[in-house]
From Swiss-Prot:
It holds the Pfam family 7tm_1. Belongs to the G-protein coupled receptor 1 family. The chain crosses the membrane at residues 36-56, 76-96, 109-129, 153-173, 223-243, 346-366, 383-403. The keyword RNA-binding does not apply. Expressed in the ASI and ASK chemosensory neurons and in the IL-2 interneurons, but weakly expressed in other head neurons in hermaphrodites. It is found in: Cell membrane. Residues 57-75, 130-152, 244-345, 404-415 are cytoplasmic. Residues 1-19 have a biased composition (Low complexity). PROSITE patterns: G_PROTEIN_RECEP_F1_2 (PS50262). Residues 1-35, 97-108, 174-222, 367-382 are extracellular. It comes from Caenorhabditis elegans. This is G-protein coupled receptor daf-38. Disulfide bonds join C107-C187.
């Protein structure tokens, strides 16, 4: 069974011409083994993913105050729910019936929401990456309210852009009665309909291949442009972390006593709490004005450490000595720990997105470069498509909605 020429994540119904039986041209096509396998995986993804995402939705919506990461997780949860409750049922119903019975209006609306669901997923992941980048570059990181407003604005723009990109589907997809004698109709792109109507007529190659350029533009907007933005953002963040994790006199207190190097959590914490990046300098100028009372950072090397508030009480003189050696209060400890967790959760979500989306979109590019090579890998395409659905299933596990709650009154809007 061939895939449509517009092999993008918005192409979610196989056209009638793709499953058309050449030996019996007058009969509707019948499902094959790969269709039943795909239907099984869709149902399995729904059974596992729907409860997880609904539980995540319930817990996220019950939180009285929202950090930046909570806002990003909410938007990602909304897009995952769209994928699981709009795309999965409609695709499964089509595989079950091999017929489109919703009429022209529903065909257009469903296709628009398909594109909207996948485009919003990509856009939210971009927001997560850009938020991590701005936490290093932007001065608003030191103002929690400004940072929270910035994240809200990014998400609003992301959803509006997803809606705008989805609207052309209203004009590209149509319900088409392919076999009137069997009342067998399909929801097809206008180019597929034109090819079917001209099946027995001489083919005229158009000067401007609208379908080709539409496919290139669409796959770029859905995946490749977001992927490039994500990669650039994390390259800058990782470069910033690496440069500023080099051993120096100023940060000797952040070394591990076992290895003599910065711990992983210390490096991650620095990426979210240091001053905004202006130039990639190595702090050559050591002669800085000494401040009368500076509070060094705490090394967050183990998330299971006992908070400082639970440690034995000490005398005032000992407390003064502890302050001089760089130990913060439990509030500072929790804030640094939450920043470190936020960075790791963000990185996990981005990595899962790349792993799940890249195979399908690579194959979609191959069809434009080498159709013969592309044809040899068609049997793997639906498996790669299921990886994209699986991404919506695994996201709640990655951002850990079932984990321990963080303090809602400390560091709000800073993560």
């Amino acid at each position: 069974m061939l895939l449509p020429s517009n092999l993008t994540t918005s192409t979610l119904m196989t056209s009638s011409s793709e499953s058309y039986d050449a030996d019996n041209p007058g009969l509707p096509p019948e499902p094959i083994l790969s269709d039943y396998v795909e239907m099984f995986t869709l149902v399995l993804n729904f059974i596992v993913g729907a409860p997880l995402n609904l539980a995540a939705y319930t817990q996220l919506s019950e939180r009285p105050t929202s950090t930046r990461l909570d806002l990003l997780k909410r938007s990602l949860n909304y897009s995952d729910l769209l994928v699981l409750f709009i795309y999965v049922p409609s695709r499964a119903c089509w595989l079950l019936t091999y017929d489109w019975r919703g009429g022209d209006a529903l065909c257009k609306i469903v296709k628009m929401f398909h594109t909207f669901a996948f485009q919003s997923s990509s856009n939210v992941i971009v927001c997560i990456a850009v938020d991590r980048l701005l936490s290093v570059l932007s001065p608003s990181h030191h103002s929690p309210n400004k940072a929270l407003k910035r994240t809200k604005m990014m998400l609003i723009v992301a959803w509006i852009v997803a809606l705008v990109i989805s609207c052309p589907q209203l004009f590209i997809w149509k319900a088409y009665l392919a076999l009137p004698e069997y009342n067998w109709s399909q929801c097809l792109q206008i180019w597929e309909i034109a090819r079917m109507e001209k099946f027995n007529k001489p083919q005229v190659v158009p000067e401007f291949d609208a379908e080709f350029w539409y496919s290139i533009l669409h796959i770029s907007l859905v995946f490749w442009i977001p992927c490039i933005i994500i990669m650039l953002s994390y390259i800058i963040v990782i470069s910033w972390v690496w440069i500023n994790s080099r051993p120096s006199i100023r940060h000797t207190s952040s070394f591990s006593f076992h290895t003599g190097c910065d711990t992983v959590d210390t490096v991650l914490t620095r990426a979210s709490e240091w001053n905004p990046l202006k130039t990639f300098s190595r702090h050559v100028n050591i002669k800085e004005p000494e401040k009368p009372m500076t509070t060094p950072r705490i090394v967050v090397s183990d998330e299971t450490e006992v908070p400082l508030t639970q440690r034995p009480s000490i005398s005032p003189s000992e407390a003064s000595a502890v302050m001089r050696t760089g130990v913060h209060t439990s509030t500072s400890y929790n804030a640094n720990l939450n920043r470190s967790r936020a960075l790791r959760v963000s990185l996990l979500l981005v990595v899962a997105y790349i792993i799940c989306w890249l195979p399908y979109n690579l194959i979609s590019l191959i069809q434009f470069l080498d159709r013969d090579f592309f044809s040899s890998y068609l049997k793997h395409v639906h498996f790669c498509q299921q990886l994209i659905i699986f991404n919506s299933v695994v996201n709640p596990w990655l951002y850990g909605f079932f984990g321990p709650r963080r303090p809602s009154t400390t560091g709000a809007g800073r993560h």
